[in-house]
Amino acid sequence: GLNSPSEKDLEQKAEEFIQQHHSSFVSLYLLDKYFVQKESPDFNKIKKLIEVMTGILQDKLYIEQLNEAISLSEKTGTGKYAPFFSLSNIKGEKITRSSEDLKKKNLLINFWASWGDSISNHQSNTELKEIYQKYKKNKHIAMLGISLDIDKQEWQDAIKRDTLNWEQVCDFGGLNSEVAKQYAIKQVPSNILLSADGKILAKNLKGEQLKKKIEEVVTSAEEKEKQDNKKKK
């Protein structure tokens, strides 16, 4: 796993190398491999390492892009308010966070695309369908699929083929679509869990972790509702 000593040792060695070789392109490679390509990158650490690098490397387009990616990822970190979106569903209706079926609920957004890796897609859809079956009548959580497809027909076919019965939206911009940039989505499938007041609770949880987190969130909303009802009486 990520926390096995070898991974930590490698990171430490990579960091030492970067600190000592301010203008080596190997430093860029190590920065990318050991610090950027992680499930939850430590952006403060990455920023510090970028500062260490000298002009030659700082001028690189990669560093510019990295700085941009860092600021986006920080904006979409856990605890931050989720960016606004307005996207069309299959019927052509505009769907936003405050649409009737989504407002005042926790919201699980899954980003996907029919062109994504079929094994990952299948695994992700199987999980999402189980969650949907369990909670579709629950008033405390809703689901939304945001597709990064480019072709309308392929998008619609995939929804039918994979029986994705929760609300689905798309703006056909692919990975360059505004919503993918705003939510700092680098790959599909990925997901984000939002609280009822629109804050980011978690990103890219999978399997049991995702199910457990949703259960926690829903249970706590139900408890709160009970308390509120008691107060009213």
Question: What is each stretch, according to the model?
Answer:
Residues 112-115, 155, 166:
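Signature tryptophan residues that serve as conserved aromatic anchors
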Residues 120-162, 174-180:
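Structural microenvironment flanking redox-active thiols in thiol-disulfide oxidoreductases
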Residues 103-129:
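Conserved redox-active cysteine motifs that mediate thiol-disulfide chemistry
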